[in-house]
């Protein structure tokens, strides 16, 4: 069983029977880490809606914390922090993390922990902006598909992927492209800018109702049976 708490925007707190994971925190209430569980804190890149130095306050609250941060984030010399470039694998006795190059900034994470496989895209997405330069659009789309191909052999339990309403009618392409290549049991749309009706629109227009875990309120908690 996975316990998933939606914090804000692209930030989630995930609890397994042994481990807690915090992704892309910048604001909101962070759930308490149960005694005896290790906490891993991820930041996919330095953008203000995905990263805040406030995450380092957690070291004062918990003894067993490790930070896995994209290498574009300003460096701090601390043994509890690992800075990860794209296309590497980090592992310790509890966790294995594969990284992928974002077509925006930083990295995406594939996390294998306690028998679960979780994908957090950060800002890796099909950013098919209407009216944008075609050469740039082709570049970002090709890079997105290149990175998806690297993930296709994973059996993912939960994938956290942007569903950004600012892309207008192209809002869904990041998820639909992902589903054509990768295998996931559940999808969690994120990066919705509090316009959660885009999730219902996705289900109505694209389907996948049984795969979508819809978080529409900050602080919402869902127990997910895998």
Language model regions located:
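Active-site-proximal loop/helix segments of hydrolase catalytic cores
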Residues: 103-180
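Binuclear metal-ion centers of metallo-dependent hydrolases, dominated by the metallo-beta-lactamase
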Residues: 4-9, 78-92, 103-105, 171-226
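Divalent metal-coordination and catalytic microenvironments
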Residues: 14, 24, 45, 97, ...
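Conserved beta-strand hairpin/beta-sheet module of binuclear metal-dependent hydrolase folds
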Residues: 1-33, 107-132
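Active-site metal-binding motif and surrounding structural segment of the metallo-beta-lactamase
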Residues: 27-74, 149-160
């Amino acid at each position: 069983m996975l316990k998933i708490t939606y914090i804000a925007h692209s930030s989630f707190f995930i609890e397994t029977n042994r481990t807690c994971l915090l992704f892309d925190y910048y604001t909101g209430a962070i759930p308490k880490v149960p005694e005896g569980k290790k906490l891993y804190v991820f930041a996919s890149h330095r953008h203000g809606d995905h990263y805040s130095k406030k995450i380092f306050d957690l070291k004062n609250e918990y003894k067993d914390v490790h930070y896995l941060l994209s290498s574009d984030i300003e460096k701090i010399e601390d043994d509890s922090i690992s800075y990860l470039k794209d296309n590497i694998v980090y592992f310790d006795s509890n966790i294995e993390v594969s990284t992928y190059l974002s077509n925006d900034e930083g990295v995406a994470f594939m996390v294998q922990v306690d028998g679960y496989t979780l994908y957090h895209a950060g800002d890796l997405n099909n950013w098919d902006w209407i009216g944008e330069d075609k050469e740039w659009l082709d570049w970002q789309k090709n890079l997105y598909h290149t990175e998806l191909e690297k993930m296709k052999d994973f059996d993912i339990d939960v994938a956290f992927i942007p569903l950004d309403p600012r892309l207008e009618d192209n809002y869904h392409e990041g998820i639909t492209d992902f589903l054509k290549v990768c295998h996931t049991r559940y999808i969690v749309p994120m990066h919705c800018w509090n316009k959660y009706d885009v999730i219902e629109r996705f289900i109505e227009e694209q389907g996948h109702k049984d795969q979508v875990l819809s978080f529409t309120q900050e602080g919402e908690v869902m127990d997910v049976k895998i």
